Curated annotation (Swiss-Prot):
EC top class named in words: hydrolase
Keyword Cell membrane: yes
Protein name per the record: Ribonuclease Y
InterPro entries recorded: HD/PDEase_dom (IPR003607), HD_domain (IPR006674), HDIG_dom (IPR006675), KH_dom (IPR004087), KH_dom_type_1 (IPR004088), KH_dom_type_1_sf (IPR036612), Ribonuclease_Y (IPR017705), RNase_Y_N (IPR022711)
Bilayer topology annotation: Single-pass membrane protein
CDD domains associated with the record: HDc (cd00077), KH-I_RNaseY (cd22431)
Region of interest: Disordered: 107-138
Classification via SMART domains: HDc (SM00471), KH (SM00322)
Protein source organism: Lactobacillus delbrueckii subsp. bulgaricus (strain ATCC 11842 / DSM 20081 / BCRC 10696 / JCM 1002 / NBRC 13953 / NCIMB 11778 / NCTC 12712 / WDCM 00102 / Lb 14)
Length: 547
């Protein structure tokens, strides 16, 4: 009984152990399968991630390679453009250098011509001095001859008295005339003889006096020229502006040259940029435009912001400053000469002469000099000194605006002085100082003499510069005479004319016709060396302000 009980327990225990072992094995197998599944899934996930990452890396490599190729292409394009810009800049530099060299050669030639003229004047003065010495010797000899003739005449008179006495005795003996009648006859004969001798002496003395008067007149003129001599600086057609560094040249030129084109169009002055370190050159025959351009460029350099709108603003400011300086120059001239009560508009026109030259001579300085000379001579002669000074100062007032108004500077000056109620004698002196009308007073004669002394003194004037300016003025006048032309500037020393037209009056098609018409008139009416380029510019702007 007991054995039967034990057996089932053992069996149960064995079964339990077997079941436990089988359960463990089954659990292990299941867990192993799960682990293997998870490991496979993890491996597949890792492989997928690695494949995705590898694909992304390949894409990134492709993009980087594409970007690298694009960068290489951009670099090659930049190098090509850089080389082209360098070649273009070098070409422009060569052109500017050639222009500057041509200008320097022209100035050297002009200086050589001036030196030759000065040498000729010195030779002429030496020759005149030698002639004066010879004339003085001749006068000394003539004086000795006159003295000898006087002694001879005295001897003849004594001889005549002796003859008279003999004739008296003879007449008394022959005609039995009384002494008084005989004396009358003899005196009449002697008087006729002495009259002839006296006439010869008078003619000789008149010739001598005339020669001495000429010599004294020459001496007076020389003294007047020496007393009126003033320091004179030769006028030029260029101004030099200093730069803080050479990098500023590129900013002045601007992108594709737009800044330099805007500057030249707004000022009418040629801006020359060459390889001269830290400097640029402004070239133009109109001194007022050149001064405006110089001040505007200096302001732009100081400000640092250089673009077309800023250029236009600075040019307007510089033009206002120059206009103020012109008025101050007129007032200074009046104060220097002690002239009062002149119309302000006439004072402003007078100040413009500061920037006007005639044959290379500054017209304002020349006018002040003429006023001083005329006043000095009027005071010496007891005439109205203040009126003479006023007439001398205003005698060339027409030259201030003769580029803008039709007519000679004399006609313009007469019209201006009448308009602003100057005295009639002043108006007549202006009208008569070139012999166009009769002189009504000695004041007009004094103005002519003072004008001659001031303009004729050595080194005062240079004809070549005046001819050059006249040619450029005529060139601008031809270009500006057409309807629709707003402004016309002669630049490049007269080798180019830039014509600004009004877009509302002239179309794009018409500017070509206008350029050819201007060319034909220039070829027909002007004499000039080389070629002249006619450039017609039509620009239309649209401006809107956002608030």
């Amino acid at each position: 009984m007991m054995n039967n009980t034990v057996f089932p327990l053992a069996t149960v225990a064995v079964i339990f152990l077997i079941s436990l072992v089988v359960g463990c094995l089954i659990g292990y197998a299941i867990r192993k399968n799960v682990w293997e599944t998870r490991a496979e899934n993890a491996r597949q996930s890792v492989e997928a991630i690695l494949a995705k990452a590898k694909a992304e890396v390949e894409v990134a490599k492709a993009e980087i390679q594409a970007q690298k190729q694009a960068a290489e292409a951009v670099k090659r394009d930049a190098e090509t453009e850089k080389k082209a810009k360098i070649l273009e800049a070098q070409e422009e530099i060569r052109d500017y250098r050639q222009k500057v060299e041509d200008e320097l050669n022209r100035r050297r030639d002009e200086a050589a011509r001036k030196e030759n003229r000065l040498q000729q004047k010195e030779d002429t003065l030496d020759h005149r001095s030698s002639l004066l010495d010879d004339r003085e010797k001749q006068l000394t000899q003539r004086k000795a001859q006159i003295k000898q003739q006087e002694e001879k005449v005295a001897g003849l008179l004594e001889e005549a008295h002796g003859l008279v006495e003999k004739q008296n005795d003879k007449l008394l003996e022959i005609s039995r005339l009384d002494e008084e009648e005989a004396k009358k006859i003899v005196l009449a004969q002697v008087s006729d003889h002495l009259t002839k001798e006296k006439a010869e002496l008078i003619r000789a003395n008149e010739e001598e006096i005339s020669a001495r008067a000429d010599r004294f007149a020459h001496q007076i003129i020389v003294d007047a020229i020496q007393s009126s001599a003033a320091d004179t600086v030769a006028e030029t057609t260029v101004s030099v502006v200093d730069l803080p560094n050479d990098d500023m040249k590129g900013r002045i030129i601007g992108r594709e040259g737009r800044n330099i084109r805007s500057f030249e169009a707004m000022t009418g002055v040629d801006l020359i940029i060459d390889d001269t370190p830290n400097t640029v050159t402004l070239s133009g025959f109109d001194s007022i435009r050149r001064e405006v351009a110089k001040r505007a460029l200096q302001k732009l350099i100081k400000d640092g912001r250089i673009h077309p709108a800023r250029i236009e603003e600075m040019v307007d400011k510089a033009r206002k400053e120059v206009n103020d300086d012109i008025y101050e120059a007129g007032e200074s001239a009046l104060m220097e000469l002690g002239i009062h009560r002149m119309n302000p508009e006439l004072v402003k026109i007078l100040g413009r002469l500061k920037y006007r030259t005639s044959y290379g001579q500054n017209v304002l300085a020349h006018s002040i000099e003429v006023g001083k000379l005329a006043g000095t001579m009027a005071a010496e002669l007891g005439l109205d000194e203040k009126l003479a000074v006023r007439a001398g100062l205003l005698h060339d007032i027409g030259k201030a605006i003769d580029h803008d108004i039709e007519g000679s500077h004399v006609e313009i000056g007469v019209e201006l002085t009448r308009k602003y109620h100057e005295p009639d004698l002043v108006v007549n002196a202006i009208a008569a100082h070139h012999g166009d009308v009769p002189k009504l007073s000695f004041i007009a004669d004094l103005v002519v003499a003072a004008d001659t002394i001031s303009s004729a003194r050595p080194g005062a004037r240079s004809e070549s510069l005046e001819n050059y300016i006249r040619r450029l003025t005529e060139l601008e006048d031809i270009a500006g005479s057409y309807d629709g032309v707003k402004q016309a500037y002669a630049i490049q020393a007269g080798r180019e004319v830039r014509v600004m037209v009004e877009p509302g009056k002239i179309s794009d098609d018409e500017i070509t016709v206008l350029a050819h018409e201007i060319r034909d008139r220039v070829e027909k009416e002007l004499d000039y060396p080389g070629n002249i380029k006619i450039t017609v510019i039509r620009e239309k702007r649209a401006v809107a302000v956002a608030k």
